[in-house]
């Protein structure tokens, strides 16, 4: 591109102003002479700082162009996948779309967990600020704060009715809350270190918890007594999750393993060992996903004749793995995140996996084709947790940036 005489003159004056104002006197004199510039103080005022302004605006434009190119590529990809001409898309294929519907502020420290209520249009979040907050996700309104823990609240879990909420904390306790009266009805002591994870069993009679003390404990809801302790992990147990019928309990740990336990006998049914770093998160695949999983992994699954249940794990090695618990085999490894994977779940429709990570993204995976089909830049800092509503078209994410975001799916 050739500059006109006027543009050339303006550029030369802007360069001269930059050299002079930054103290490059010798270069300024030489340049002024070479460019045959007649510097006029009044005239040159309008060129003050012009070069820096142009430079920053070029960078800004480049960034915008890159963003637009990325969106264009996403759109092309979706068209290739038969994507979202999707006002008519089947709810089983709803996926979160940017931008977020709400970005909710209120926590004063990183958000550690986000979960939807199983019945009402509310969600609950926990934070390192030692509080639990309740929000209306449809209206984007804050409703109330539950206080009681004296240190970071690490995890929260509803029972299937949504009447009880369990929470656990770095204060080494587990609390049970009446979610109708928003009161703490029981505090359980027994772990010797930070309690990192909690889950109410599907029957609602027991709670399981995992701790940095390397143990998993089972507690009776009615009495608050510890009735079982599961030992075997060699390091901090990061997360614990029961399967759909409560017969199995999965756990993951800093020892880089995932273990599956028989709930009644405490027997370790499987020890899954292929991750190369701390395993941060786990999630059971719902029954609705089994046909797609079997189709996607037919060769691996059919070798043994029996298959399932299936478990997902996410690790600091940046990968997500899918396991067949009947055989202990890793069926697939999904690679794409650029940092620690912090949350993972199977889409309620059974066809996709949704994950979040310290690379600040939310990703949707078409696991049948073992590829990431959509990446959302979700937060300005690490994304610590996500949840997807079982029936309504919403995903929620929480972050170290102290915000909670609600994403609409379509």
Swiss-Prot record:
BP GO annotations: cell differentiation; cell division; establishment of mitotic spindle orientation; microtubule sliding; nervous system development; reelin-mediated signaling pathway
GO cellular component: 1-alkyl-2-acetylglycerophosphocholine esterase complex; centrosome; cytoplasm; microtubule; microtubule associated complex
WD repeats: 106-147, 148-187, 190-229, 232-271, 274-333, 336-375, 378-410
Entry coiled-coil feature ranges: 56-82
SMART domains: LisH, WD40
InterPro entries on file: Dynein_regulator_LIS1 (IPR017252), G-protein_beta_WD-40_rep (IPR020472), LIS1_N (IPR037190), LisH (IPR006594), PAC1-like_LisH-like_dom (IPR056795), WD40/YVTN_repeat-like_dom_sf (IPR015943), WD40_repeat_CS (IPR019775), WD40_repeat_dom_sf (IPR036322)
Location within or outside the cell: Cytoplasm, Cytoskeleton; Cytoplasm, Cytoskeleton, Microtubule organizing center, Centrosome
Protein origin, superkingdom: Eukaryota
Functional description taken from the UniProt entry: Regulatory subunit (beta subunit) of the cytosolic type I platelet-activating factor (PAF) acetylhydrolase (PAF-AH (I)), an enzyme that catalyzes the hydrolyze of the acetyl group at the sn-2 position of PAF and its analogs and participates in PAF inactivation. Regulates the PAF-AH (I) activity in a catalytic dimer composition-dependent manner. Positively regulates the activity of the minus-end directed microtubule motor protein dynein. May enhance dynein-mediated microtubule sliding by targeting dynein to the microtubule plus end.
Family of the protein in this entry: Belongs to the WD repeat LIS1/nudF family.
Record protein name field: Lissencephaly-1 homolog B
Species lineage: Eukaryota, Metazoa, Chordata, Craniata, Vertebrata
């Amino acid at each position: 591109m050739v500059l006109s005489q006027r543009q050339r003159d303006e550029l030369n004056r802007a360069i001269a102003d930059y050299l002079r104002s930054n103290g490059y006197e010798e270069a300024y004199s030489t340049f002024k002479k070479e460019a045959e510039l007649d510097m006029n103080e009044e005239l040159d005022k309008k060129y003050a700082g012009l070069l820096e302004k142009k430079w920053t605006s070029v960078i800004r434009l480049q960034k915008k162009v890159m963003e637009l190119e990325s969106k264009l590529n996403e759109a092309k990809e979706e068209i290739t996948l038969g994507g979202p001409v999707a006002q008519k898309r089947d709810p089983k294929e709803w996926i979160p779309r940017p931008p977020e519907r709400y970005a909710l502020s209120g926590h004063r420290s990183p958000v550690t967990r986000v979960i939807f209520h199983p019945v009402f249009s509310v969600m609950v979040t926990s934070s390192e600020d030692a509080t639990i907050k309740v929000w209306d996700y449809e209206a984007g309104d804050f409703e109330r704060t539950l206080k009681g823990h004296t240190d970071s609240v690490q995890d929260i879990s509803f029972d299937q009715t949504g009447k009880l909420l369990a929470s656990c904390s770095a204060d080494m306790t587990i609390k049970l809350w009446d979610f109708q009266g928003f009161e703490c009805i029981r505090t359980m002591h027994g772990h010797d270190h930070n309690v990192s994870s909690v889950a109410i069993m599907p029957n609602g009679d027991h709670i399981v918890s995992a701790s940095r003390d390397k143990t998993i404990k089972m507690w009776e809801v009615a009495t608050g007594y510890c009735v079982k302790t599961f030992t075997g992990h060699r390091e901090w147990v990061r997360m614990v999750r029961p399967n759909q019928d409560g017969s199995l309990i999965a756990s993951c740990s800093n020892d880089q393993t995932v273990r599956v336990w028989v709930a009644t006998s405490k027997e370790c049914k499987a020890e899954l060992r292929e991750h190369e770093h701390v395993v941060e998160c786990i999630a059971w695949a719902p029954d609705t996903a089994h046909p797609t999983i079997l189709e996607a992994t037919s060769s691996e699954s059919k070798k043994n004749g029996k298959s399932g249940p299936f478990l997902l794990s996410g690790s600091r090695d940046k990968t997500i793995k899918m396991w067949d618990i009947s055989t202990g085999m890793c069926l697939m490894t999904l690679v794409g995140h650029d940092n620690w994977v912090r949350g993972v779940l199977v889409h309620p429709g059974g066809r996709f996996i949704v994950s979040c990570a310290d690379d600040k993204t939310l990703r949707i995976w078409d696991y049948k084709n073992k590829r990431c089909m959509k990446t959302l830049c979700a937060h300005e800092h690490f994304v610590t947790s996500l949840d997807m509503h079982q029936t309504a078209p919403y995903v929620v994410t929480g972050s170290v940036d102290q915000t909670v975001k609600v994403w609409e799916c379509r």
